[in-house]
Each structure stands twice: as C-alpha cells, then as structure tokens.
C-alpha cells in the first residue's frame, strides 16, 4: 500500500510538472522596434548546424550560425557563431531549420553566449516586410528613445511626447499587425515621437502618433 501511494505521488508530481512546463511559455506582444531596441544582439544568419547540450533539466539547443549581417550588438559581440535556446518549445525554445533559411534573430547576451527564445523576435528573412528590413537598417535605432504603448481598447491617448500608440492589439494581430509590419516610431528634433512610414528620410514624412 505504501509503495502504491509513493508511486501515485510521483505520478501526480510528474503530471503537474508536465502541465506546468506546457503552460510555462507566455509572451507579451511586442512591436518589432521594441524587440530590436531591447535586444543585445540582432543579426541576419543562416543556421548551419545544431547540437543538444546536456545542461539543465531539459537541455539547451546550440545552433551554429553563419552570420550574414549584424544590425545591433557590434560593441558586445561583433561576430556570432552560436545561438543558444531552450531545447523545449514549452520552455520558450525556438526551432530553427538547418541549411534551409536565413533568419532574423534577436537575443540577449549572458556570460558570453547569445540566447534567444519564443519571446524574442525571430523570423524567416523572406517573411519580413520591406519596412521591417528598413527598420533594422536604421529606423528602429532612431526610435529607441521612444516608447511604444500598446492599446487594448479604445480610446487610447499618448500620455507623454515620446509615446506612440500601438493599436494592432485591437484586432488581435499584435506582432503581425499592420503597424508592426509597416511602421516605426521615430523621434523628431523637438523630442516628439510619431509613427513613420514611407520611403523618404524620417524627418520628411511624419504621421500623427495616434493615426497609423
């Protein structure tokens, strides 16, 4: 009887742990510009290899990458060879395919290693919009002093001059919404931040902060 109760306790603990892990990865929607500005490293790279590292209870996946271009992180790590992520998607680990695609990868540096996850911005390069690519090259950097405030229900108003109101959540698009795909929040000379879209330099075409 005692042995059976012991087995039941272990089973229930294992089941609870499994449920906890399955529900562990929850990410708050973030605009690509904020994802860029909050990252230590932003690169365009192709995955050329992977290896499961036996560290931690669930392991860590180490991806070997061929860096094509760096957009952020020159002073921290000018060349990235490895990207680390949790081996399990339930722990926010990302799954990248080897020798197939070029990816945009953002991440943070910890003890000399670049870590990324589902809550970081990563995407197949050919799925990025032209505006997002231009943002990576210079526009997002120009807006790192701005604050992008999500709007979950109307009305929404900017509470300071450096805010842009992000309304993609009103239609549940979030990261893949129209503003996320096509707009950057740029700071002007006067210190005001506004949404910007277009092919002219940011100081020539500025739109209203609440009207993307």
Swiss-Prot record:
<feature type="signal peptide">
    <location>
        <begin position="1"/>
        <end position="24"/>
    </location>
</feature>
<dbReference type="InterPro" id="IPR030490">
    <property type="entry name" value="TIMP_CS"/>
</dbReference>
<feature type="disulfide bond">
    <location>
        <begin position="146"/>
        <end position="193"/>
    </location>
</feature>
<comment type="function">
    <text>Complexes with metalloproteinases (such as collagenases) and irreversibly inactivates them by binding to their catalytic zinc cofactor. May form part of a tissue-specific acute response to remodeling stimuli.</text>
</comment>
<feature type="disulfide bond">
    <location>
        <begin position="25"/>
        <end position="92"/>
    </location>
</feature>
<feature type="region of interest" description="Involved in metalloproteinase-binding">
    <location>
        <begin position="89"/>
        <end position="90"/>
    </location>
</feature>
<dbReference type="InterPro" id="IPR001134">
    <property type="entry name" value="Netrin_domain"/>
</dbReference>
<feature type="disulfide bond">
    <location>
        <begin position="164"/>
        <end position="185"/>
    </location>
</feature>
<feature type="site" description="Involved in metalloproteinase-binding">
    <location>
        <position position="38"/>
    </location>
</feature>
<dbReference type="GO" id="GO:0008191">
    <property type="term" value="F:metalloendopeptidase inhibitor activity"/>
</dbReference>
<dbReference type="InterPro" id="IPR027465">
    <property type="entry name" value="TIMP_C"/>
</dbReference>
<keyword id="KW-0481">Metalloenzyme inhibitor</keyword>
<feature type="region of interest" description="Involved in metalloproteinase-binding">
    <location>
        <begin position="25"/>
        <end position="28"/>
    </location>
</feature>
<dbReference type="InterPro" id="IPR008993">
    <property type="entry name" value="TIMP-like_OB-fold"/>
</dbReference>
<feature type="disulfide bond">
    <location>
        <begin position="37"/>
        <end position="144"/>
    </location>
</feature>
<feature type="domain" description="NTR">
    <location>
        <begin position="25"/>
        <end position="144"/>
    </location>
</feature>
<dbReference type="InterPro" id="IPR001820">
    <property type="entry name" value="TIMP"/>
</dbReference>
<protein>
    <recommendedName>
        <fullName>Metalloproteinase inhibitor 3</fullName>
    </recommendedName>
</protein>
<keyword id="KW-0646">Protease inhibitor</keyword>
<feature type="disulfide bond">
    <location>
        <begin position="151"/>
        <end position="156"/>
    </location>
</feature>
<dbReference type="GO" id="GO:0051045">
    <property type="term" value="P:negative regulation of membrane protein ectodomain proteolysis"/>
</dbReference>
<dbReference type="GO" id="GO:0009725">
    <property type="term" value="P:response to hormone"/>
</dbReference>
<dbReference type="GO" id="GO:0031012">
    <property type="term" value="C:extracellular matrix"/>
</dbReference>
<dbReference type="GO" id="GO:0005615">
    <property type="term" value="C:extracellular space"/>
</dbReference>
<feature type="disulfide bond">
    <location>
        <begin position="27"/>
        <end position="119"/>
    </location>
</feature>
<keyword id="KW-0732">Signal</keyword>
<dbReference type="Pfam" id="PF00965">
    <property type="entry name" value="TIMP"/>
</dbReference>
<keyword id="KW-0483">Metalloprotease inhibitor</keyword>
<dbReference type="GO" id="GO:0034097">
    <property type="term" value="P:response to cytokine"/>
</dbReference>
<keyword id="KW-0272">Extracellular matrix</keyword>
<keyword id="KW-0862">Zinc</keyword>
<comment type="similarity">
    <text>Belongs to the protease inhibitor I35 (TIMP) family.</text>
</comment>
<keyword id="KW-0479">Metal-binding</keyword>
<keyword id="KW-0964">Secreted</keyword>
<feature type="binding site">
    <location>
        <position position="25"/>
    </location>
    <ligand>
        <name>Zn(2+)</name>
    </ligand>
</feature>
<dbReference type="GO" id="GO:0005604">
    <property type="term" value="C:basement membrane"/>
</dbReference>
<keyword id="KW-1015">Disulfide bond</keyword>
<dbReference type="GO" id="GO:0008270">
    <property type="term" value="F:zinc ion binding"/>
</dbReference>
